Amino acid sequence: MQCALYDAGRCRSCQWITQPIPEQLSAKTADLKNLLADFPVEEWCAPVSGPEQGFRNKAKMVVSGSVEKPLLGMLHRDGTPEDLCDCPLYPASFAPVFAALKPFIARAGLTPYNVARKRGELKYILLTESQSDGGMMLRFVLRSETKLAQLRKALPWLQEQLPQLKVITVNIQPVHMAIMEGETEIYLTEQQALADRFNDVPLWIRPQSFFQTNPAVASQLYATARDWVRQLPVNHMWDLFCGVGGFGLHCATPDMQLTGIEIAPEAIACAKQSAAELGLTRLQFQALDSTQFATAQGEVPELVLVNPPRRGIGKPLCDYLSTMAPRFIIYSSCNAQTMAKDIRELPGYRIERVQLFDMFPHTAHYEVLTLLVKM
């Protein structure tokens, strides 16, 4: 992938950009095999990759510069701002949005937040696109509600320029720290969730719910999990750390009993909406801590699917699963290092199948799906 920002030394986020994709996949596969070297793996499936540019459905832009000439991008470690509107990871559809946002920031008087001086209002612009219909969700992250009335007043101009903006919100993040969002979300549109579709499964995106950033590869990840589950004698499963329900909604059949657990209420609202659309009445989604939910149960289903954050599922949940011994565990991980550590805590299981998904091209990161079977 060619990137003028990288070539000019202005951005180094894509550290592997000079390596061809096949070389990147080989290096990632070698890393994964090294992490799982102590465990016999019955089947290594071929790695899955997607487009090498224009694949991201989300932009997280630090706003800097001045109200008349805002920059959208990032801050270097020394505080120097860098405009990343031309980043080739973003689809072409993002360019007109960035182009309209810059004059809008001036129109609305949204002074960019200055980290060094701790002054200003507009901290971040968060943009998400639906791969199914091109609709977009735009979030303004502000330090306070001081400029909210001005933003509302100027908003009709932006909506006229960009009719693809279906959901627009203001998030209030008052803390002087590099935290992307605060707890308060103020909706400026009637529509509160963005509709998307993966493999004919409706998924909804709300402001404070996690959603995969590479739809092409995520679609294949969900479809693979569905195919693996369909090959197993399973009538009841848990989907822990379920997010908006991507895995569970793909894996469930009308006859299957499924419980999805996720701590974020916004994500659970999305999952419930999807289940209702699909007419899946035996699916239950609850906004709870996944570990606390599981360890409070006196029995387990045949299959437990886990998709934890980078820290992994942790020893308490591993100990519980070891004791309760569900027949199958499917582990989806964005950090193979913590997954390997967790598998070490599950000595009663063997690795049936592993597949790498290149969700993050040009970096050392990847997603991995692992099927564990009770010995």
Swiss-Prot record:
Reactions this protein catalyses:
uridine(747) in 23S rRNA + S-adenosyl-L-methionine = 5-methyluridine(747) in 23S rRNA + S-adenosyl-L-homocysteine + H(+)
Q: Read off the Pfam families from this record.
A: tRNA_U5-meth_tr (PF05958)
Methyltransferase in keyword set = yes
Q: Keywords in alphabetical order, please.
A: 4Fe-4S, Iron, Iron-sulfur, Metal-binding, Methyltransferase, rRNA processing, S-adenosyl-L-methionine, Transferase
Tell me its EC number(s), please: 2.1.1.189
Q: Which InterPro entries match?
A: 23SrRNA_MeTrfase_RlmC, MeTrfase_TrmA_AS, MeTrfase_TrmA_CS, SAM-dependent_MTases_sf, U5_MeTrfase_fam
User: Which positions are catalytic residues?
Assistant: C334 (nucleophile)
The record's annotation in CDD domains points to:
AdoMet_MTases
Q: Which Gene3D superfamilies does the UniProt entry name for this protein?
A: 2.40.50.1070, Vaccinia Virus protein VP39
What are the binding positions for S-adenosyl-L-methionine in this chain?
Q212, F241, E262, N307
What is any one GO biological process for this UniProt entry?
rRNA base methylation
Question: What class does this enzyme belong to in the EC scheme?
Answer: transferase
Family as reported in the entry's similarity comment: Belongs to the class I-like SAM-binding methyltransferase superfamily. RNA M5U methyltransferase family. RlmC subfamily.
Q: What does this protein do?
A: Catalyzes the formation of 5-methyl-uridine at position 747 (m5U747) in 23S rRNA.
Q: Which PANTHER family match?
A: RNA M5U METHYLTRANSFERASE, TRNA (URACIL(54)-C(5))-METHYLTRANSFERASE
Protein name, please? Answer: 23S rRNA (uracil(747)-C(5))-methyltransferase RlmC
Source organism: Escherichia coli O17:K52:H18 (strain UMN026 / ExPEC)
Q: What is the lineage of its organism?
A: Bacteria, Pseudomonadati, Pseudomonadota, Gammaproteobacteria, Enterobacterales
Q: Which gene encodes it?
A: rlmC
